[in-house]
């Protein structure tokens, strides 16, 4: 991954974390690497544990950011979330899976939040 792309991704995650804090959520972890994949942001709001996938783009020529979270990516996030819950012993909290799309327009950010962007059958 190029430095420029990594830098854009980090910028988007910083924007998303700030947005979540302003919504009253507590950021528990960021960029967690698990044996089964990475989690961008883990936040808590009341009795809910929110796993947030952040997608950042400069424009829409490669599609809208949220479109990059397909079925395979959802499965990877689910496996990583299961690992996180077991490792941290937080299984009493209700999980939710969100996507935050960040589009960079010059120095400005456009944030779109999709709470409960995908559901997990049988959770």
From Swiss-Prot:
CDD domains: PoNe_Nuclease. Pfam families: UPF0102. HAMAP family: UPF0102 (MF_00048). Belongs to the UPF0102 family. It comes from Syntrophotalea carbinolica (strain DSM 2380 / NBRC 103641 / GraBd1) (Pelobacter carbinolicus). InterPro entries: Restrct_endonuc-II-like (IPR011335), tRNA_endonuc-like_dom_sf (IPR011856), UPF0102_YraN-like (IPR003509). SUPFAM superfamilies: Restriction endonuclease-like. This is UPF0102 protein Pcar_2217. Gene3D superfamilies: 3.40.1350.10. GO terms for molecular function: nucleic acid binding.
